[in-house]
Regions:
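Short beta-strands and strand-coil junctions in structured, solvent-facing domains, enriched
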Residues: 507, 561-562, 572
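The conserved cystathionine-beta-synthase
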Residues: 477-495, 500-501, 520-523, 527, ...
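C-terminal hydrophobic structural anchor segments
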Residues: 381-384, 532-536
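Alpha-helical transmembrane segments and immediately membrane-proximal extracytoplasmic
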Residues: 1-463, 467-473, 477-498, 502-508, ...
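Short hydrophobic beta-strand motif reused across regulatory alpha/beta modules
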Residues: 509-516, 574-582
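Structural signal for short hydrophobic segments within the conserved structured cores
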Residues: 473-478, 533, 538-541
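Short aromatic/basic micro-patch
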Residues: 460-463, 510, 528, 575
Length: 595
């Protein structure tokens, strides 16, 4: 009874909103609520993670060397795996890739558990020291909220995808208090088509997320940036150098991530993965405590110049007093952070690479400035180079230069740094993109053919379900049929095209009635000629596994108006008409181009 009553209210609400407000106003109103829910989820997760870390650090002995670091990560990964496998019973993934796949494969539809499952799993992983970030799980959470709200209101695929993007925008805006960057993220990373109809809902969600974050978390930012120094033209060569360096470190990041994922993938037993990953991660964190968790506290130590604090709980603390040893440890942190991140996710932890890219970039930028100052006698501003390094690695790993530029510019309130950020991000991107075609989020999707593209033509050809326009009504006849039997088929058919099947019901050839008119009217040949003698072999087939691009290329190459569709085993499926293909393609483009 209650369920029916609630369903009736929902139906009435949907009808009222669409009739009284119109679809555009409905989307704007829903984007506001998505902004509230997405931002609230991000705020809750941030607080839960900090509470978990505070509980662990305050409950257990605070010795000079904290050996509990050996145990925390493995406990976190075990709890995460139990939660995902026993409670959620579904693959949660690490966030952005799942969102991208849903946009491309399922019209922006995400499962309802994604509204909370990533929140819990990422809190367990990161709170217990997993060397990953919360941002990607929050993107998935916000996106799932938008997607499921769209489902509730029976919105079409285009508007579902838009509300999905609004959810991710709200979550990112709430985390960093950076609304412009959050919108750029939705466009550049989630590959949302920017239209006038899409921009306003994104603005509403981004603004709502930022305001809520300011309301509940105050003006404090994730990164404690006191002040930046003005941009000095003479430092451009160092920013160029930093761009090149962050570019190659981004390539290392992507390839090391891929390599470690591959190694863990070969391990079939989840218990062995957890054991190896947990022990390895714990040992790395014990030696280099800066690897614990997201790493924003370590970045803040760099920004304040308190580098020694990074090694306070490490067995290596005494060695860090020597400046050259400090450099060595900082370089180790840059390279080992990537390994720690890959091990965390590969062993079963849930988290993203957003925070790790900022971490690696910050340490890279600090090293460039410190080496130039200490050994070469320059006076480079550490803070500026830390920020530029963060933008450089993020740009290279995510292949998202605009997102990285606007993030650092907004969180540092330093648009005076725009030129250095642009130089570093662009050069890093240019170093990576010729070598690594896909970003950390899109590689696996591209390998499986699930990747959306900003090229509308290619997107349409991949997205459209061509099976629905296959013509299954072409008459088939056996290969040993006589001309007499062929004429009987002709009398019953409205088509002038026929398919010939062999003894095993496999595709053998085609019969075009116009090619045989002289024989059809010659009754003396009726029992002498077989269709085997008359049929032709098409010069080209469309296979059921062909992509939209391959199919269209075959039509253009052969100049045929109709082509048979078969399997690689020559099982006959039907016919595709070039006219229907182009008509469906035009309708799809028109639907996705409307404002």
């Amino acid at each position: 009874m209650r369920k029916k009553f609630g369903s009736s209210i929902l139906v009435c609400s949907r009808r009222w909103m669409k009739q009284k407000l119109g679809i555009q106003a409905t989307i704007l109103l829903l984007s506001f609520f998505v902004g509230i829910f997405g931002a609230t989820a991000a705020i809750i997760v941030k607080n839960l993670m900090h509470l978990t870390v505070s509980f662990l650090t305050n409950t257990f002995p605070n010795a000079q060397v904290n050996y509990y670091y050996l145990a925390f990560p493995i406990i976190g990964i075990v709890l995460t795996v139990i939660y995902t496998r026993r409670i959620v019973k579904d693959h949660i993934g690490h966030g952005v890739s799942i969102v991208l796949k849903s946009i491309f494969k399922s019209e922006g539809k995400l499962r309802s558990h994604n509204m909370y499952s990533s929140m819990v799993a990422s809190t367990l992983t990161v709170g217990f020291g997993g060397s990953v970030g919360l941002e990607a799980p929050m993107v998935l959470t916000g996106s799932a909220i938008g997607s499921n709200l769209a489902k509730l209101f029976n919105l079409n695929a285009k508007n579902t995808t838009l509300l999905l993007a609004c959810g991710s925008t709200a979550a990112v805006a709430a985390i960093f208090k950076a609304p412009i960057m959050a919108i750029v993220f939705a466009i550049e990373v989630l590959m949302l088509d920017l239209t006038s109809a899409a921009l306003l809902p994104l603005l509403i969600s981004a603004a709502t997320g930022t305001v809520l974050s300011l309301l509940f978390l105050g003006n404090t930012l994730t990164l404690d940036i006191a002040s930046t120094q003005s941009f000095f033209l003479g430092n451009i060569p160092f920013y160029i150098l930093l761009g090149i360096l962050t570019g190659f470190i981004s390539i290392y990041f992507l390839r090391m991530l891929r390599m470690i994922e591959g190694l863990f993938h070969k391990i079939k037993r989840i218990s062995v993965k957890i054991l190896i990953g947990g022990v390895a991660l714990g040992a790395l964190i014990l030696l280099l405590p800066a690897l614990f968790g997201e790493g924003y506290e370590s970045i803040n130590s760099l920004l304040k110049g308190d580098v020694a604090d990074l090694f306070e709980k490490s067995p290596l603390f005494m060695l860090s007093h020597e400046h050259y040893m400090l450099f060595i440890f900082l370089i180790l942190i840059v390279f080992i952070k990537v390994i720690a991140t890959a091990v965390t996710t590969s062993a079963g932890g849930i988290g993203g690479v957003f925070a790790p890219t900022l971490f690696v970039g910050a340490f890279t930028g600090f090293l460039v400035a410190d080496i130039a100052n200490y050994y070469l006698g320059f006076n480079l501003p550490h803070i500026n180079f830390v920020l530029a390094g963060m933008a450089g690695v993020m740009s290279g790993v995510m292949l998202a230069p605009l997102t990285s530029i606007f993030l650092i510019a907004e969180i540092s309130a330093g648009y005076s740094l725009l030129i250095p950020l642009m130089i570093t991000s662009l050069i890093s991107y240019l170093c990576v993109s010729p070598i690594e075609k896909y970003s950390v989020y899109t590689r696996q999707l591209a390998e499986k053919g699930h990747l959306k593209t900003h090229n509308k033509d290619k997107f349409a050809l991949k997205k459209i379900n061509w099976n629905r326009i296959i013509d299954h009504n072409i008459t088939t006849l056996p290969i040993h049929s006589t001309l007499r039997e062929y004429t009987q088929y002709i009398a019953k058919s409205k088509r002038n095209l026929f398919v010939v099947l062999d003894e095993n019901k496999k595709f053998a050839g085609l019969l075009v009635m116009d090619d045989h008119r002289d024989k059809i009217f010659n009754q003396e040949l009726y029992d002498k000629v077989l269709v085997d003698d008359l049929m032709i072999e098409p010069e080209e087939f469309i296979y059921d596994t062909d992509s939209g691009e391959e199919m269209l290329e075959k039509f253009n190459r052969t100049q045929n108006f109709n082509m048979p569709v078969i399997t690689h085993e020559r099982d006959y499926i039907g016919f595709l008409s070039k006219a229907k293909v182009l008509n469906l393609y035009r309708n799809f483009i028109a639907a996705y181009s409307e404002d």
